[in-house]
Regions:
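Short N-terminal edge-element motif at the start of the domain
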Residues: 1-24
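Short HxH-centered metal-ligating active-site micro-motif
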Residues: 58-114
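Glycine-rich, aromatic-bearing surface loops/beta-hairpins
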Residues: 107-210
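Eukaryotic short linear interaction motifs
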Residues: 39-42, 104-105, 149-150
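N-terminal interaction modules that seed assembly of large macromolecular complexes
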Residues: 16-65
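Alpha-helix boundary/N-cap detector
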Residues: 1-9, 61, 177, 181, ...
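Short alpha-helical segments and helix-capping/turn motifs at coil-helix boundaries
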Residues: 14-18, 79-81, 124-127
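Short, surface-exposed beta-edge/turn micro-motifs
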Residues: 27-30, 93, 136-139
């Protein structure tokens, strides 16, 4: 079971990573979350060529396809996946960083207000990026081996500048009744990737060899 100090370390490390970004229009990134010390974690980048992200255009599908591919790769004798750097520490989870557009219900922009109203009524709306007044965000969605879910976001303050707000973090444990409020294709793809690379138990063969 992942203890509270490690959960807090994951939150802090994800927020620090998002805070370190200074440019926009970056390609998405996926990484493992590994325990580097008693109360510390490290993020280890899983390389995905930019051409892969650009060719598909829908990052969650790229992550889901990556999960399906790496699931078939061989493993180390101890059951750990080849993508997990053993020297970085025990695997705790997986994270997925990306950029997205969102609509703020408190926005004064007429186009945003209309889009929010139509969404609440169950109607269709244009793509968020096409709506005048929408907000641009850097995001990290992460999941851990205990079923916990993490969401970290930072909003661009002005379109003409690169500064963003201080990252906001949200953690929902597996037992949290509000856990289902953090769902969607991004969460599903991240879970698939974690399931594809998480450690597998070592099986004894009939001859007594591992």
């Amino acid at each position: 079971m992942i203890q509270k100090p490690i959960v807090q370390a994951i939150e802090q490390t994800l927020a620090a990573h998002l805070r370190s970004r200074t440019e926009w229009d970056e390609p998405p990134v996926v990484f493992t979350i590994q325990q580097s010390g008693p109360d510390s974690v490290v993020l280890v980048h899983i390389p995905v060529p930019r051409v892969v992200w650009d060719a598909h255009g829908h990052p969650p599908t790229v992550v889901a396809n990556l999960a399906a591919t790496v699931h078939q790769l061989p493993r180390h004798p101890d059951g750990t996946h080849l993508l997990v750097h053993q020297r970085a520490g025990k695997l705790l989870g997986v994270g997925f960083r990306y950029e997205a557009y969102t609509l703020a219900a408190s926005s004064d922009a007429p186009a945003v207000q209309e889009a929010v109203r139509r969404r609440k009524a169950g109607g269709s709306v244009p793509r968020f990026r096409e709506i005048v007044g929408r907000r641009e965000e850097r995001c990290i969605t992460a999941v851990d081996l205990d079923g916990g879910r993490y969401m970290v976001t930072a909003t661009r303050i002005e379109q003409a500048k690169s500064e963003a707000t201080e990252p906001r973090t949200k953690y929902l444990a597996f037992s949290d009744p509000k856990r289902d409020t953090l769902t969607g294709n991004v969460v599903d793809a991240t879970i698939r990737l974690l399931n594809a690379i998480k450690p597998l138990p070592i099986r004894d063969d009939p001859g007594g060899h591992r």
